Amino acid sequence: MRHVANQRIWAPWRLAYVKDASKDIEEECIFCAFPAQGSERDVENLIVHRGEGCFVILNKFPYTNGHLMVAPFAHVSSLPQLPAETTAEMMELAKRGMTILERTYSPHGYNVGFNQGRVAGAGVEHHIHMHVVPRWGGDTNFMPVLADTRVMPQTLEQSYEALAGGFE
């Protein structure tokens, strides 16, 4: 394996995310705004499932195809602030998402977890959410691109179509 430390990372699809990072995140919380727009806009907003207290959404700036996020409808910034029922629903939706990802993409593994707080890597730090990132051998680390360009074999729209039906 060749040494890749201090190499350039090429992930052009994340540029829009990086540019938006300097904006005031509390200006508009996507995890509040998107569900509030109603289920008729779920395809446009990439919401693949709505539960009682949580929903599942595709990451608009994915690390890999099928990168899901599970978020509560309640606007809270930390896991301890959530009621036990909501935390349990988040875990059940993550498990369900992994089952659907398994059937759809057959990943070799997953990264599942929370980035709570900006210093921990949270892009939307004021609304707790869980990442479910399918992984394949050869994608190197949490970022699918390290030194060489990785081709995303599917558009977000194709990922939505492939995954949304599994939650029904």
Where on the chain are the PLM-derived regions?
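HIT superfamily nucleotide-processing domains
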Residues: 1-168
